[in-house]
Amino acid sequence: MMLRLLLVLGLIVAAVISAPCFAAADRVALVIGNARYPDADPPLKEPVTDARDLAEELKRDGFDVDLLENASGEAMRHALDRLYGRIKPGAVALLFFSGYGIQSNRQSYLIPVDAQIWQEADVRRDGFSLETMLGEINGRGAGVKIALIDAARRNPYEQRFRTASAGLAPVTAPSGTLVMYSAALSAVVADSGGDHSLFAQELLKEIRVPGL
């Protein structure tokens, strides 16, 4: 898993961060770190720090970054609308999400902090479909679409309607899209307990390589 993570993150960084042909206005990113879910106690340790540090690195590399912390459903909707509106034809569009994610009907949903999830239908009502978001980004003309999803955590919601966490689902993505999960499909990972998740730690390490 570590070798694969390093290889894929290296590919992502090399394909985007080091591409000189994209001006700042042609690189847009939405970075979300959700840690304070009322149904989760204590709050997650890693998502906000991961999001802040990644946002800073992306800004240094020429991205126009929108950073959200502990975002409600309304805040995520508005931020996604802003992201879609900032995309120019051929642009690089990057989405990073750290928090809880849930699989439903073979799609992965990113969960805002104010979600009210008691049954599986609530996931589709309150969550944000990754597949739908990537389709919208593609429809706005982005040339390179990147989704970095650190949401395969065991969460407090699924135990209400499942015997075990289902992890995240494979995504049917448009061409020119790179999707990277922090764990294998349908698998779950625990927080490291440190300042950064392993996923974010390796991503930041790749971005900070001198010369990129």
Give each language-model segment a name.
Residues 27-29, 209-212:
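Caspase-like cysteine protease fold
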Residues 34, 151, 182-184:
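Fold-independent oxyanion-binding glycine-rich loops
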Residues 159-167:
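Short, surface-exposed loop/helix-turn segments at secondary-structure junctions
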Residues 55-59, 169-174:
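Short, conserved catalytic or adaptor-binding loops enriched in Gly and charged residues
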Residues 174-202:
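The feature captures the short pre-catalytic strand/loop hairpin that immediately precedes
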Residues 74-98, 102-160, 191-199, 204, ...:
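Caspase-like (clan CD) cysteine peptidase catalytic core
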Residues 26-27, 63, 142-144, 174-177:
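Short glycine-/polar-rich loops that comprise or flank the Walker A/P-loop
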Residues 2-109, 114-119, 159:
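Boundary/activation segment at the start of structured domains
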